[in-house]
Amino acid sequence: MSCPVIELTQQLIRRPSLSPDDAGCQALLIERLQAIGFTVERMDFADTQNFWAWRGQGETLAFAGHTDVVPPGDADRWINPPFEPTIRDGMLFGRGAADMKGSLAAMVVAAERFVAQHPNHTGRLAFLITSDEEASAHNGTVKVVEALMARNERLDYCLVGEPSSIEVVGDVVKNGRRGSLTCNLTIHGVQGHVAYPHLADNPVHRAAPFLNELVAIEWDQGNEFFPATSMQIANIQAGTGSNNVIPGELFVQFNFRFSTELTDEMIKAQVLALLEKHQLRYTVDWWLSGQPFLTARGKLVDAVVNAVEHYNEIKPQLLTTGGTSDGRFIARMGAQVVELGPVNATIHKINECVNTADLQLLARMYQRIMEQLVA
């Protein structure tokens, strides 16, 4: 017996949509949504395909997701070609199965079932889909959100289909995410011969006490919703490769994943004060990829928890851990934002897979969320 959720997931996996190439995935989704009365607006920017679709009017629940995937890696190490979906022992294998073509299929099938049962639903059901989430994310959801905000588009609730679950579908729901701030720092010295250090100024030696103090800072202790802010050095480079040359510069890149206890400006001020304390000559460049956001208990969180409890008989954990997602952009619209999706154990890995029963369950959960908020 065929299942529409699994069939649509397989059709999407067959399209090798390496970010930001959509490879025809959105055309497939748009066709299905238009068939049930959705108005679809293409919102492409540069090399990225996006669309905003809606049906009905009033209080708005949007489902958000991305059609792009990360590269599959060595295809020979997959049990089957990564873009040829295969089911083995109840598991659907293929790049994007869990992140996040399975969620997209579950959303669309849930919408089809919902509209069939509630053709005159009282609220507005919407979709925000992009092909640029896995790579730069410069021309995807962020640009769509900016365009929607510019025309005062209404968005009350948003369900992002990122793979939030750990062991069983719905055991973890993300009701927020930490902020992400990256510092690209260059410490300037004077290049010279290692035998004549008095004629040079070693930026590595200069920077060492600063870096030692930086990594020892306890930025905050977190709060009931967020873990403590984390700072990690990601890259550090200096030198010419020769053992007799004192380098002229040291480059270090470090990233903060920060809670709502801090702002990006507070972090910047503390780092700059530390640089001045150590009397370093430097240039610095900051990249804020997202502010922290939190959706407290309310109608959306309650609807999601209810759907999970109804179909999986478990109470989901509400967490804000993990990396960033497009939810950080959508939260700017003032919407309640929650992430609910499949188990994330194999995302971005060789042999990415998802339990087919989980996708069927996810579609039912999504439909129940629609019924609670916009029926």
UniProtKB/Swiss-Prot annotation:
It catalyses: N-succinyl-(2S,6S)-2,6-diaminopimelate + H2O = (2S,6S)-2,6-diaminopimelate + succinate. Disulfide bonds: none annotated. It comes from the Bacteria. Pathway: Amino-acid biosynthesis; L-lysine biosynthesis via DAP pathway; LL-2,6-diaminopimelate from (S)-tetrahydrodipicolinate (succinylase route): step 3/3. The active site is at residues 68, 133. Zn(2+) 2 binds at residues 99, 134, 348. Pfam families: M20_dimer, Peptidase_M20. GO terms for molecular function: acetylornithine deacetylase activity; cobalt ion binding; succinyl-diaminopimelate desuccinylase activity; zinc ion binding. Its cofactor is Zn(2+); Co(2+). InterPro entries: ArgE/DapE_CS, Bact_exopeptidase_dim_dom, DapE_proteobac, Peptidase_M20, Peptidase_M20_dimer, Peptidase_M20A. SUPFAM superfamilies: Bacterial exopeptidase dimerisation domain, Zn-dependent exopeptidases. GO terms for biological process: diaminopimelate biosynthetic process; L-arginine biosynthetic process; lysine biosynthetic process via diaminopimelate. Zn(2+) 1 binds at residues 66, 99, 162. Keywords: Amino-acid biosynthesis, Cobalt, Diaminopimelate biosynthesis, Hydrolase, Lysine biosynthesis, Metal-binding, Zinc. Belongs to the peptidase M20A family. DapE subfamily. Catalyzes the hydrolysis of N-succinyl-L,L-diaminopimelic acid (SDAP), forming succinate and LL-2,6-diaminopimelate (DAP), an intermediate involved in the bacterial biosynthesis of lysine and meso-diaminopimelic acid, an essential component of bacterial cell walls. This is Succinyl-diaminopimelate desuccinylase. It comes from Shigella boydii serotype 18 (strain CDC 3083-94 / BS512). The lineage of its organism: Bacteria, Pseudomonadati, Pseudomonadota, Gammaproteobacteria, Enterobacterales.
